[in-house]
């Protein structure tokens, strides 16, 4: 097997993401003619500790959202250092990119510039070996297909409606295979659309493909999902479970949780009561960002109360950052980390975060962003690290479906070796 192949050219360009904003795409050219390509996603609700996404700020072009400065950083600064490097030295290249930037949040070159290069390098290396990306990243034991954490109802900053919480999702943990899990989700999605139509609600969709109706309350979102699961022919709490992304940092103001659409302002303890009440009433298996990113005491409380029976995912809390994750582990908060490549900015740092989480007994959920492209790297990544869970939107909008379709291909390729862990993917809760 090859172990040395030089990078001969690096090209970055500005393309559009699924929200019609510019993003960075990078191509890496190798001496044998191989090309590797990667496109970078972008978030709507972002944690304050995320690596910095470099935007131009020129209001005359793309409302200030252009990424030409990030493109220039790749084509001029990064390319000069990268050309001549061995494409198989991923760790060395990522370290070089971090040092070239020189800041603790990648604000000089931009995490979008750095991530585009990091992922394109990995894709180029895999392509040169004629090897699937998941196999190149993860090795021979990469075989676990993920349980989808599928967004079917949107609220918060992902939709323009009356729901405070950001995402209501379904997880087919009772399915026997990934392909069956996807079918179950698709059927619930279509059933939910009919239910919403029959109730006179809009079936317009949000950034991630979930429906965004003007429901009367946050709880009504759970009720219509339970109805959809049943009418689709499945048992809630046995075959299909509910997951929530509360994105609570978005409505955390002056130390309180302000649920504007419900006209309620809650303390941390009351917010935990709010979720505990839901967990007792509904088959909720996972809550993401139930507490705000700076509410460490709230996180301690929700972990003490719910951490043995519900997956508590830190997204804004951890931002795929090993320093934040280490603090959380030391404090005993949450029991899972959401993995978003662009929160930290390189493949190596992402893999380090997953490894740290696994060592501490935390689950890892590999995730998309609300602004996505047709890039399917995260589908390969989730299999590469045997994470067992993926969050990549509804079975609608092609930038979301692209990831699911790639996972179907991987499942087919792995054939009898493919493993769908279902309920066992939640190994640290009862």
Swiss-Prot record:
SUPFAM superfamilies (UniProt xref): Enolase C-terminal domain-like, Enolase N-terminal domain-like
Recorded GO CC terms: cell surface; extracellular region; phosphopyruvate hydratase complex
Subcellular location: Cytoplasm; Secreted; Cell surface
Residues that hold (2R)-2-phosphoglycerate according to the record: 166, 340, 369-370, 391
Reactions it catalyzes: (2R)-2-phosphoglycerate = phosphoenolpyruvate + H2O
GO molecular function, one term: magnesium ion binding
Domain of life where this protein originates: Bacteria
EC identifiers of the protein: 4.2.1.11
Residues holding Mg(2+): 245, 288, 315
Entry annotation: catalytic residues: 208 (proton donor), 340 (proton acceptor)
Pathway(s) it belongs to: Carbohydrate degradation; glycolysis; pyruvate from D-glyceraldehyde 3-phosphate: step 4/5
Cofactor binding, note field: Binds a second Mg(2+) ion via substrate during catalysis.
Entries under Gene3D superfamilies matching the protein: Enolase-like C-terminal domain, Enolase-like, N-terminal domain
Similarity field: Belongs to the enolase family.
Name by which UniProt lists this protein: Enolase
Species per Swiss-Prot/TrEMBL record: Clostridium beijerinckii (strain ATCC 51743 / NCIMB 8052)
């Amino acid at each position: 097997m090859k172990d040395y192949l030089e990078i001969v050219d690096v090209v970055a360009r500005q393309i559009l993401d699924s929200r019609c904003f510019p993003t960075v795409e990078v191509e890496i050219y190798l001496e044998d003619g191989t090309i590797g390509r990667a496109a970078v996603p972008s978030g709507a609700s972002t944690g304050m500790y995320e690596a910095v996404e470099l935007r131009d700020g020129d209001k005359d072009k793309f409302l200030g959202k252009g990424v030409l400065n990030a493109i220039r950083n790749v084509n001029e600064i990064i390319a000069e250092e990268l050309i001549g490097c061995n494409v198989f030295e991923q760790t060395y290249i990522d370290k070089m990119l971090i040092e070239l930037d020189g800041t603790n949040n990648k604000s000089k070159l931009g995490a979008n510039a750095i991530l585009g290069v990091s992922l394109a390098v990995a894709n180029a290396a895999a392509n040169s070996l004629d090897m699937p990306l998941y196999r190149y990243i993860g090795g021979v034991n990469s075989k676990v297909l993920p349980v989808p954490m599928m967004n079917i109802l949107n609220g918060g900053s992902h939709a323009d409606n009356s729901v405070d919480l950001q995402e209501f999702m379904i997880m087919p943990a009772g399915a026997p295979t990934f392909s069956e899990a996807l079918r179950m989700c698709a059927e619930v999605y279509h059933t939910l659309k009919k239910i919403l139509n029959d109730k006179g609600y809009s079936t317009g969709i949000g950034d991630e493909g979930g429906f965004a109706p003007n429901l009367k309350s946050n709880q009504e979102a759970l009720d219509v999902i339970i109805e959809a699961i049943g009418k689709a022919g499945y048992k809630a709490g046995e075959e299909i479970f509910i997951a929530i992304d509360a994105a609570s940092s978005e409505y955390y103001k002056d130390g309180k949780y302000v649920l504007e659409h419900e006209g309620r302002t809650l303390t941390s303890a009351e917010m935990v009561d709010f979720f505990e009440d839901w967990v007792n009433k509904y088959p909720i298996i996972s809550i993401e960002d139930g507490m705000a990113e700076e509410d460490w005491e709230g996180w301690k409380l929700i972990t003490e109360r719910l951490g043995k029976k519900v997956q508590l995912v830190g997204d804004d809390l951890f931002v795929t950052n090993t320093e934040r994750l280490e603090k959380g582990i030391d404090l005993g908060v949450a029991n899972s980390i959401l993995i978003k490549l662009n929160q930290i900015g390189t493949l190596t740092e992402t893999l380090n975060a997953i490894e740290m989480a696994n060592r501490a007994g935390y689950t890892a959920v590999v995730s998309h962003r609300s602004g996505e492209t047709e890039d399917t790297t995260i589908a390969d990544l989730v299999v590469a690290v045997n994470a067992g869970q993926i969050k990549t939107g509804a079975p609608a909008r092609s930038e979301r479906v692209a990831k699911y379709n790639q996972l179907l291909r991987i499942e087919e390729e792995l054939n009898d070796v493919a493993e769908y862990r279902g309920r066992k993917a939640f190994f640290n809760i009862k």
